[in-house]
Amino acid sequence: MKEKKYILFIVMLLMNTFTSIAQNDFDLTQRWFNETLYNPASAGNNFSTGVFLHSRLQWVGVSGAPSTHAGTFDTYVEELRSGFGLTFAADKLGSMSNYNIRLAYAFYIPIGQKSVLSLGLSGGILSRNRRLQANDSESTIDPSWAYGNVSDYSSDFDLGFEFKGPFKLGASVRHLASQPVQYNLTKHSMSIWTYLSSRFNISESLSLEPMAAVLYTESSYRAELGAIFYFLKTESKSTYSDKFWLGALYRTGNSFAVLAGMNLTSKIRLGYSFDYAIGDLSSIAKAGTHELFLSFYLNRIFYKDEVCPAYREHIRRR
């Protein structure tokens, strides 16, 4: 009951801050492995130090199609019950290039021995460059800049929460105070992303993680539904690791994706996904979308019966 009250309060707080929203952000299929890119409350949620790198080539073969390169560094400090993160992203769509760098902070509140609620905030700089073409002379940005480059930047802030226990539930409100310095290039309306997943063992060597998410955009929304099977390797009576995983993901009216990956070592893992466009895009994006991610953990151990590190520190301070 106490856990439900915490979650309900945070959800209501975030919903009340979200008014008008628009599609502005880069998209990654494998963000399920690195929520910190979209939610500051996820910084340090693996209770270790890690580096994540993503590279995405969308609609291969289509001129001006989007491409994205992104990454995070995050760590958890048990004495502070806090996670810290640094995220960056560079994506390109046609004549538009976007660059974003942020610092993220998350504070962890233990709820029992194996559940934790984190509250996060991130802030940074959003930069956008547009190479104007002849057909941009009527641009609402500034017609005098036609046939040239226009650059702009703004400060940017995100707010989020994440509950991690028998299931994972999170939400983030993005672009809380995004105002362009000179032009209208970097002005972002607020957007919100909510997600839910739960992982459970089917056998000693196999586990399943169903997941769902909703991304709200201006006057519409997009849902994601998927599942990932993890094939496990037992290290000892108390620890295990993922040997490899296979999964599938469906985005309503947008695409269908397959995901696969493996642990190259106990600290390094590699993942790949392929998105096949459906609906109106299927006729022009026949080659699909390819995405790779690489992660490196300095000190992560997977426990079968893990006690939350935030709870351990909470007990120590009593």
Model-assigned labels for residue ranges:
Residues 6-16:
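Sec-dependent N-terminal signal peptides
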